A protein has these predicted regions:
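Structural helix-boundary/capping segments
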Residues: 1-23, 39-42, 46, 109, ...
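Short connector loops at secondary-structure junctions
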Residues: 49-66, 97-98, 172
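Acyltransferase
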Residues: 31-54, 79-84, 108, 112-129
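Short, surface-exposed loop/helix-turn segments at secondary-structure junctions
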Residues: 136-155
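A generic structural signal for short coil/turn motifs at secondary-structure boundaries
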Residues: 25-30, 108-109, 141-144
Length: 203
């Protein structure tokens, strides 16, 4: 969007959607899972073809690898702030920076090697799907403003370097908002935005 690239306009054909449950499916709360599956059933009634994405073991390490790489990069970027103003940083930020400082060069190289393997495995999916649908979070948005929630289910897409976005998907019994997440192929930003528009219009 910052580049000014318009969303693609899907043709008359409905999308081929891959449901990716992630290795963390059992940790996702019931309202989020139920809302996602119900939305997919509605999309099927509008012509979408939904199929399960097979488990991709190459993607499993990315959830932790992304955190390690991000913490390491943050530790380098905020080295001055850590050294000179450590007491003014939040406990969570200090912990992240210290974890990044402790990450060894060998561990980082291994994380990047796993990332490259995962990117190759992910690229092989796109003969069968137009987009991936997956949970956006483990549950509803947290109440209040103390936290923006757990980023766990976004990390793999960030490290894969592929477009991902979230769409509103109802509310839990407390009235807190739920979301579904869409992911695309590498470089497929415009196509993913176009399919997001189709989903919002269809159901």
């Amino acid at each position: 969007m910052l580049a000014g690239v318009p969303a693609s306009t899907p043709g008359s054909a409905a999308p081929r959607i891959g449901l990716y449950r992630t290795p963390h499916w059992e940790r996702i709360d019931a309202p989020s899972r139920d809302a996602l599956l119900a939305r997919l059933r509605r999309l099927e009634r509008h012509g979408a073809r939904v199929a399960e994405v097979p488990d991709l073991p190459a993607l499993h390490p990315l959830y932790q690898d992304q955190r390690d790489i991000m913490n390491h990069q943050a530790a380098r970027a905020l080295l001055h702030e850590y050294r000179q103003h450590r007491e003014q940083l939040s406990p969570a930020l200090r912990a992240a920076l210290e974890a990044g400082q402790a990450c060894s060069p060998d561990a980082l190289r291994a994380a990047w090697q796993r990332t490259r393997r995962a990117r190759r495995a992910y690229a092989e999916l796109w003969a069968d799907y137009d987009l991936i649908v997956t949970p956006a979070a483990l549950g509803a948005a947290p109440a209040g403003i103390a936290s923006s929630g757990d980023s766990l289910l976004n990390r793999n897409w960030s490290l894969l370097g592929v477009p991902a976005l979230s769409l509103p998907n109802g509310a839990d019994p407390r009235g807190l908002p739920l979301a579904m997440q869409l992911a695309g192929s590498h470089g497929g930003d415009a196509a993913l935005l176009g399919w997001a528009r189709w989903i919002e219009a269809a159901a």
